[in-house]
């Protein structure tokens, strides 16, 4: 952050733990993944997340084309996502974003852990739970602590 400020880039903000962007310059495509929203991937090797299922297409273009020509879906493998997995991913991915997550997403059993990280200056809590600039440096550990306490 100091490097950005020293170069006159104070309007750049860390939109996600590992990415920086100017306001309005966020990659909307990647935000779909980080917000755990659904997407449909088209083409050989493409991945999709629809409903409570992830799947990916065959990788070889020839096989992909033959399957489509035969009227078959070119899906190579599927993975059903349980409610628990969906919750874990929503918390894990959402806390990595600047906007954070609704505080209600965190189970009551984790409130002591949240309070400890708030007191340490690593989290901000209101109706949303967000990592502070200091907390972003320790994001994986904080998220692991919260999820383990739920």
Residue ranges and their predicted role:
Residues 15-19:
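Conserved S-adenosyl-L-methionine
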Residues 2-13:
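Single conserved hydrophobic/aromatic residue that forms the stacking wall/gate
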Residues 22, 47, 136:
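Short, glycine-/Ser/Thr-/acidic-enriched flexible segments
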Residues 136-150:
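Short, amphipathic alpha-helical interaction segments positioned at domain boundaries
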Residues 31-34, 38-118, 128:
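Hydrophobic, secondary-structure "cap" segments at the distal end of domains
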């Amino acid at each position: 952050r100091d490097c950005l400020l020293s170069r006159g880039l104070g309007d750049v903000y860390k939109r996600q733990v590992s990415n920086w962007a100017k306001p309005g310059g966020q990659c909307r495509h990647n935000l779909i993944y980080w917000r755990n929203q659904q997407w449909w991937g088209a083409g050989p090797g493409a991945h999709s997340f629809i409903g409570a299922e992830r799947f990916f297409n065959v990788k070889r273009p020839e096989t992909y084309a033959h399957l489509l020509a035969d009227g078959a879906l070119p899906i190579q493998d599927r993975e059903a996502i349980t409610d628990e997995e969906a919750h874990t991913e929503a918390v894990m991915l959402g806390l990595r974003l600047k906007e954070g997550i609704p505080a209600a997403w965190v189970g009551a059993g984790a409130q002591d852990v949240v309070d400890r990280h708030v007191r340490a200056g690593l989290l901000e809590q209101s109706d949303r739970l967000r990592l502070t600039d200091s907390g972003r440096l320790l994001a994986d550990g904080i998220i692991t602590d919260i999820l383990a306490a739920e």
